[in-house]
Amino acid sequence: MRYYSAPRRALRGVRQLLYPRRCPFCNAVLGSIRTCPDCAEEVDRLRRKPGIRLDASQHYLGGLSGAAAPFRYEGCVRRAILRAKYQAAPWTAVELGVVLAELAFGSEVRMRDAEPVPQRVEGARLGYDCIVPVPASSRRRGYNVPERMAQPLAEALDLPLETKALGPARRKNRQAGLPFEQRLANVAGAFRVQDPDLIEGRRVLLVDDVITTGATAAACAQALLSAGAESVFAVAVATVEFPPIAQPTLPLQEDADEEI
């Protein structure tokens, strides 16, 4: 079922009556307004200009063909992502996915039934065949934030969203607070391709909420490429900008513990 299909539009209409649409950045009620005027200045200030590609001297990209993020992980952008992850706000994740489609891929966003809808761009011509969200724990929140962000992106790029392609291979510690080398070791071997037929020979667009060091995206890319993907490019709503990092020279060792 397409994300913007008629049944889902009807369900959204009911939701709008019970839970009015809110700004993903400040949580103010928006209704049918396209963007929040109160957040416009800060949102623009947090955009990464002029380019959104990540620098390999600042992030570990591993086997990725590249990575991009339109925002710095600060201020209202950081609060929006944390709200989507920890405050039971899946529609915040969807709204951020719409913004990602617009800023990263040039999709024009129009209002339809009081909802922002990204218009189609040719995803295959941009070099992608499918979209794969980074697996994340959904047991407590009931949904996967990168998957929700990827839904409007898949619609805008007219690409299949392969939610069953990639999954956890083992439990791991949380990445937050770990130094760079420990982040790499923590996610090494943490992901596996659950159905190789979904990605074999395909150019994968990997979607995450935040790219910090790049360790998680690189670990996902390693799993996808090992299973036959032709290439993997990562995109996220935001990234943390670091000074140049020293790239690892030793093989990564698996280190299992907690949960994804």
Residue ranges and their predicted role:
Residues M1-V207, T212-I260:
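Glycine-rich phosphate/pyrophosphate-handling loop used in enzymes and phosphotransfer proteins
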